[in-house]
Amino acid sequence: MPDSNITKRALAAALKELMETKPFSKISVSDICQACDMSRKSFYYHFQDKFDLVNWIYYTECVAVLKEKNFDTGWDLLEDLCLYFYNNQSFYRRTLSVDGQNSFSEYFRDIVATILAVDMEEIFGKDKYLHFYVDFYTDAFLCAIKRWLLDKNCMPAKQFTGLLKNCL
């Protein structure tokens, strides 16, 4: 593993550990660096800010892994994605509750919209309202996923995706 990834993983582990006891909004870059005995210079060499670190965690732990798989349907992809969130719900409950510029919610929305755009184009073709459909379903999925994960009695991922499928 290149040194760069070792450093990034150490910063990621520090952030995850801090988020077990502190809300994301109360964690500073200095806190993250202190937790893994690194300089702020090292942090900023690899990441723009703590939001960028969260997005990197999601990309390396989830998106990159899912890209390697061949899914028969979009539902299979959604099931794996939700299973990942369910298995890491402590971390993502805290990150999904933060909104705004550079937030994980914004990053996640962009990824979901990209995936749905491909599926929607297969369904609707070059319909002039394709962008509307993509936005609608992206927002619906994001709202449902956030509500599901933030529920203190979060149901298992398979049950959740089954209910989503029934809705559509």
Predicted regions and their residues:
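Basic/polar phosphate-binding segments, predominantly the helix-turn-helix DNA-binding elements
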Residues: 4, 32-52, 84-87, 91-95, ...
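An amphipathic alpha-helix adjacent to DNA-recognition modules
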Residues: 8-16, 25-29, 34-37, 44-71, ...
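Cytosolic nucleotide-binding catalytic cores of signal-transduction proteins
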Residues: 20-22, 128-129
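Short helix-capping/hinge SLiMs at alpha-helix to coil transitions
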Residues: 21-24, 151
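Secondary-structure edge/capping motif, primarily at the C-terminal ends of alpha-helices
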Residues: 69, 92-95, 148, 152
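Amphipathic alpha-helical segments that line or abut small-molecule/effector binding pockets
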Residues: 75-90, 135, 139, 158
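Amphipathic alpha-helical packing segments from all-alpha helical-bundle domains
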Residues: 80, 100-124, 128-143
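Hydrophobic alpha-helical segments that form the core
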Residues: 128-151, 155-168
